[in-house]
């Protein structure tokens, strides 16, 4: 599992008494000095609420999943999906959730998989992905002139932002990565040099970005 793979490295750091922090994705059981990132399950819970509003409360919704070596790409993605499903079970238990797995090491199959999905599921007009590659779906929608599909993704990769501005992605959820990195280094400095107490868990705001506000966000977070 992802925590087990991470533990192989952090165990060596602990043996050498080297402090470490986690950024973006947390594994609390590995006892990092600090964590900076979103509360992943709450982020997924929030994303579900936004997706249902965006899709005008559809009867079905698709989760586009990025699979790497037989599993989701990160612990964070798993927790986002858990939060998403929790919201749906609590508020829209009758909404059908469909999964479409795309494979990180077989990108040449993406188009065929999405062709089949959209042909077989014309009633589903709303989707979400919990990884940073929403552009894969967004660029497909642009290339096939599918203008009525509603889509939410994560992270401000250049291609994601381009899809947002072209209307293929409706919302991006941002995580303030620059702030995460800066705060993480600051925590290490405070711990190692100034011998200060460091807060162990530091959640970042869940920021929803649209074409109307994304440039302001990008300008505000330039360093």
Predicted stretch roles:
Residues 71-72, 88-91, 176-223:
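Hinge/cleft segment of the Venus flytrap/periplasmic-binding protein
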Residues 56-61, 91-99:
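Short, structured loop/turn "capping" segments at alpha-beta junctions
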Residues 8-42, 158-165:
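Flexible loop/hinge segments that line or gate small-molecule binding clefts
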Residues 37-43, 64-83, 95-112, 129-133, ...:
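Hinge/beta->alpha junction and helix N-cap segments in small-molecule ligand-binding domains
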Residues 1-14, 84, 98, 102-159:
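Hydrophobic alpha-helical
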Residues 33, 125-126, 170:
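Conserved acidic residues
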Residues 35-61, 176-193:
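Hydrophobic alpha-helical segments within soluble ligand-binding/sensing domains
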Residues 146, 168-169:
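Glycine-enriched alpha-helix->loop->beta-strand junction motifs that scaffold or abut catalytic
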């Amino acid at each position: 599992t992802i925590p087990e793979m991470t533990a192989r490295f952090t165990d060596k750091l602990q043996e050498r008494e080297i402090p470490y922090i986690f950024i973006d994705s947390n594994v609390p059981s590995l006892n990092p000095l600090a964590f900076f990132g979103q509360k992943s399950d709450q982020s997924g819970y929030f994303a579900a609420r936004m997706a249902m509003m965006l899709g005008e409360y559809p009867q079905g919704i698709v989760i586009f999943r990025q699979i790497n070596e037989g599993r989701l790409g990160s612990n964070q993605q798993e927790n986002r999906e858990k939060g998403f499903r929790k919201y749906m079970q609590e508020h829209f238990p009758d909404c059908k959730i469909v999964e479409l797995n795309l494979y990180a090491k077989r990108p040449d199959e993406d188009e065929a998989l999405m062709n089949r999905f959209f042909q077989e599921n014309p009633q589903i007009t709303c989707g979400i992905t919990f990884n940073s590659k929403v552009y894969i779906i967004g660029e497909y929608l642009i290339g096939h002139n599918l203008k009525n599909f509603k889509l939410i993704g994560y992270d401000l990769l250049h291609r994601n932002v381009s899809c947002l501005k072209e209307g293929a992605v409706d919302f991006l959820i941002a995580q303030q990565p620059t702030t995460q990195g800066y705060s993480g280094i600051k925590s290490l400095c405070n711990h190692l040099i100034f011998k200060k107490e460091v807060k162990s868990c530091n959640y970042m705001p869940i920021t929803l970005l649209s074409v109307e506000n994304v440039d302001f966000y990008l300008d505000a977070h330039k360093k």
